[in-house]
Amino acid sequence: MPSTNRAGSLKDPEIAELFFKEDPEKLFTDLREIGHGSFGAVYFARDVRTNEVVAIKKMSYSGKQSTEKWQDIIKEVKFLQRIKHPNSIEYKGCYLREHTAWLVMEYCLGSASDLLEVHKKPLQEVEIAAITHGALQGLAYLHSHTMIHRDIKAGNILLTEPGQVKLADFGSASMASPANSFVGTPYWMAPEVILAMDEGQYDGKVDVWSLGITCIELAERKPPLFNMNAMSALYHIAQNESPTLQSNEWSDYFRNFVDSCLQKIPQDRPTSEELLKHMFVLRERPETVLIDLIQRTKDAVRELDNLQYRKMKKLLFQEAHNGPAVEAQEEEEEQDHGVGRTGTVNSVGSNQSIPSMSISASSQSSSVNSLPDASDDKSELDMMEGDHTVMSNSSVIHLKPEEENYQEEGDPRTRASDPQSPPQVSRHKSHYRNREHFATIRTASLVTRQMQEHEQDSELREQMSGYKRMRRQHQKQLMTLENKLKAEMDEHRLRLDKDLETQRNNFAAEMEKLIKKHQAAMEKEAKVMANEEKKFQQHIQAQQKKELNSFLESQKREYKLRKEQLKEELNENQSTPKKEKQEWLSKQKENIQHFQAEEEANLLRRQRQYLELECRRFKRRMLLGRHNLEQDLVREELNKRQTQKDLEHAMLLRQHESMQELEFRHLNTIQKMRCELIRLQHQTELTNQLEYNKRRERELRRKHVMEVRQQPKSLKSKELQIKKQFQDTCKIQTRQYKALRNHLLETTPKSEHKAVLKRLKEEQTRKLAILAEQYDHSINEMLSTQALRLDEAQEAECQVLKMQLQQELELLNAYQSKIKMQAEAQHDRELRELEQRVSLRRALLEQKIEEEMLALQNERTERIRSLLERQAREIEAFDSESMRLGFSNMVLSNLSPEAFSHSYPGASSWSHNPTGGPGPHWGHPMGGTPQAWGHPMQGGPQPWGHPSGPMQGVPRGSSMGVRNSPQALRRTASGGRTEQGMSRSTSVTSQISNGSHMSYT
């Protein structure tokens, strides 16, 4: 366990700042225990620095559950530091000493429950309204700061001497709203607090419910169901209707206020701010109503304490002589007079720890502590200035006369115009008046009984404490499981997001690599085409040079042959003069040379035209080849994008299935845990109820045994009583006999006295015999009647107890059945909500996939359209340039024999598919004839003087010149079969099977 969580550890600076470093034993003196509870004890003390009276609550954080106790102390100190309001207890500081926290607070007179205890009757409606108004103001302050008190009751509503109402005991409070802890005092708990772990969270409206119960408590001296077992009261509150005021004497405003506070459904219950506008608290009432009530209570406390004091003095002096007794009586009267002036003090705090003390002395002792999250309820000791005689359990401390005069000068009724907001001057005066003494509205017997009940009710209190501890542990286990599953879910979600991000990054890298590869391929193709064009030109030029040389050789041979023929013709004709022959021969030579020169010029011109035409054709074929390559590369890129998108969508669907499976598994785990905790809770509740039943039966049997044991004494007492009555009767008869005898003796002659005496004696004997018979009959009848009455009374008590316990057990079973049904309904609701969330998430995912696929298809179509349009523009621009240069489009579109000529070295690289195979055609199925898109291709024009060539057998309709012909492009752009053929396959398998040369059909 971390050191910061260990009980008493101050290593955490934030925790260390909560406590003062001084030694509290040196700062506070005259400590006297004035209250006790399960948390520890409350003491009256005086601050040596200011001589001010304070209340100190000592809370130990050692022993069992030390860590929980320490956390509760820290929480309460933090809460007290945060609140500053006239209607909340003033916090003065906290000190640590020997594993005990000293919580120092202002000192108040007592609680509203003390008023009920002292007066033994309900409060008046105007008094209840004043107390409720002050409590509501404090609650409105807490609720406005998202805090919940969670233990509102009369014992936690304190009063000061100026009549100010203050909320106390924040040990159960929550600094966050909403909350879901099972805390508070059973009889005052709201239904949503009892069902907190089963049905969810609650907010500050639980304090409004508790305030309504407190109003009934002030109006009827005890809260509803107080005569019921505390555990049974919980079950009753959770499933039965809200309580109401029983008496008809209360006003409609009060009834409506209580009914509003006790609305079973929290949403129908008003807030504390809304209740401050209710007519019940806004009605006009005397400003001194609480001051007068406090003064009457103090007077009553003084009378009760003086009565106890006189009883004690009577016991002390009952054996003394008359003289000392008279002196003691006189002294008692003088002291009574002094007490009447100065008053008494029995300072104790509110009795939050033992609710039975906040009711009456005769109320049952089965009430339990109000516990906070980890320990029992703490009572904030209330106490301030006031009366001047301090009573401990066995002594009375009198004050000096000058203190009495100072008390009279500082009478709060002469300086407190507003009981809710006393001025600072009165506070300053009360501070000095409060230096030497403190006042109270509680009797000494109440303090003593509080301590005794705390010791006697330990078993019941421990049972409730254990039950609340179990509920907190169950809630902690459930929260721990939920946090664990939430962390697992977050980790799983992060892992899935990371996998998806990794895949997307890999896809982006692959696509970037592919684009770079395509760019390199285009650059390489451009270089190859430039080299091919250069080689093509060189090849044609070489052929033309060879043809020219051959032509020149042929001309030389022809010239030589013609020259020889001419010479032979001249030689045959001997008649022609030699000179003429020479001239004719020269002229013929010149003609031959001129003709040959013209033929040579014509050949050179034809060769130049052929070279220009073939180069232009070659460039067009290169352009078409580049377009085909671009189409192949774009097709490969789009197919790659399609494959990646399909793989990404497949991963998203797998992740959705994985998240769905994990969510259902987590929900099942939480629901199983909740069912198990409910089972354990119900088992504990049943065990506690059975133990309570056994304890009640055991107590009743013990009571009956004591009655049986006490019966002989009772019978003896009855017999003595009858005997005394008989003796009295005998004495009366004896006196009557004597009076009658004297009368007869006086009225009868003396001679008859003997007979008269004998007759009277016989009559007396007969009457005494009858009286003796009556005495025996009375004794026997009394014995039989008493035994029968005892048996009948005990049997009736047993029957009543059995019926009561059976009703409580049935109430528990009904409560547990309701909890199980609510849990099942909650589980079904959670399952339906999860299914709806999963279905919605799946629908959104599928919609997203569909939108992405549609966007990808649109992008694909747009890319293809823009590519074809650009290529069509390039072809059109090229053809326009060709027309300007004097080339016919028909001639350029028809393939020359050299289109597939491989006769020159290295001429094969430009005409093959750069991607490794014949790519598919854009706009027609694979294997389909391109004749559907272009005109039949005829062989190229025969070269001059070369009717046959190596490219004479070129197949008609070759795709080289068709795929990007203007006619095909125009058909594609105008929406021919190409658009239907561009529909892509959505299957990853079809793409992979077709590879990068996938058909767009």
UniProtKB/Swiss-Prot annotation:
Residues 28-281 form the Protein kinase domain. Its EC number is 2.7.11.1. The active site is at D151. ATP binds at I34, G35, H36, G37, S38, F39, G40, A41, V42, K57. Residues 458-651, 754-877 form a coiled coil. It holds the Pfam family Pkinase. Serine/threonine-protein kinase activity is inhibited by SPRED1. Proteolytically processed by caspase-3 (CASP3). It catalyses: L-seryl-[protein] + ATP = O-phospho-L-seryl-[protein] + ADP + H(+); L-threonyl-[protein] + ATP = O-phospho-L-threonyl-[protein] + ADP + H(+). The modification Phosphothreonine is found at T669. Residues 324-380, 404-433, 567-587, 905-1001 are annotated as: Disordered. Residues 975-1001 have a biased composition (Polar residues). Keywords: Apoptosis, ATP-binding, Coiled coil, Cytoplasm, DNA damage, DNA repair, Kinase, Nucleotide-binding, Phosphoprotein, Serine/threonine-protein kinase, Transferase. It is found in: Cytoplasm. Signal peptide: none annotated. GO terms for molecular function: alpha-tubulin binding; ATP binding; beta-tubulin binding; protein serine kinase activity; protein serine/threonine kinase activity. Residues 350-370, 921-930 have a biased composition (Low complexity). Residues 577-587 have a biased composition (Basic and acidic residues). PANTHER family: SERINE/THREONINE-PROTEIN KINASE TAO1-LIKE PROTEIN, SERINE_THREONINE-PROTEIN KINASE TAO1. Self-associates. Interacts with MAP2K3. Interacts with SPRED1. Interacts with TESK1; the interaction inhibits TAOK1 kinase activity. Interacts with MAP3K7. This is Serine/threonine-protein kinase TAO1. It comes from Mus musculus (Mouse). The lineage of its organism: Eukaryota, Metazoa, Chordata, Craniata, Vertebrata. The gene is Taok1.
